[in-house]
């Protein structure tokens, strides 16, 4: 099978992998905390962005390809925020929801264009039942010609070999981010 890259983004693409929410809190820092030798940031702004595989899907959509997104999220507010971010780019999210893990979230605190701290809210999804992700993956393949696997080592692609085999059986191109 050969893939004509000039027409790649006219075909439906399914992105599957580790989806996450990137949050940025920003503000000035003009003093050191009296409690510990750390800067105090007066938060004046915040922004949420799609991260990981969700960012890959947004980039694909911006190139003009219709796009599905498959990943695992928690049963929480951050999952709803992430879903809204990808839907804003006309991406069809097919998230597997688990109530045992939070949505992977990276919270960065910035001041004066400098990252001061990053807080990671995550558990590895490798122990989540893979049946759900396989079912979500297969149901997202309708009309897809290309699958992009986006692995950040968070466990969403624990069954990647099975997913690649499904792509081979269906004649779908597989790419790795």
Where do the model's predicted regions map?
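Flexible glycine/proline-rich, aromatic-decorated loop/lid segments
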Residues: 31-35
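Ribokinase/PfkB-type carbohydrate-kinase core domain
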Residues: 1-30, 45-177
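Divalent-cation-assisted or electrostatically stabilized phosphate/pyrophosphate-binding catalytic cores
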Residues: 37-44
């Amino acid at each position: 099978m050969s893939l004509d890259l000039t027409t790649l983004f006219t075909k439906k693409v399914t992105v599957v992998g580790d989806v996450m929410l990137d949050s940025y809190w920003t503000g000035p820092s003009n003093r050191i905390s009296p409690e510990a030798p750390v800067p105090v940031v007066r938060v004046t702004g915040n922004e949420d962005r799609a991260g990981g595989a969700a960012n890959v899907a947004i980039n694909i959509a911006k190139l003009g390809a219709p796009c599905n997104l498959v990943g695992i999220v928690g049963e929480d507010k951050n999952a709803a925020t992430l879903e809204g971010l990808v839907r804003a780019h006309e991406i069809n999210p097919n998230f597997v929801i688990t109530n045992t893990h939070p949505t992977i979230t990276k919270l960065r605190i910035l001041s004066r264009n400098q990252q001061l701290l990053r807080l990671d809210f995550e558990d590895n999804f490798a122990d989540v039942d893979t049946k759900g992700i396989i079912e979500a993956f297969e149901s997202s393949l309708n009309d897809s010609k290309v699958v992009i696997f986006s692995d950040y080592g968070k466990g969403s692609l624990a069954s990647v070999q099975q997913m690649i085999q499904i792509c081979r059986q269906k004649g779908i191109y597989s790419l790795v981010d």
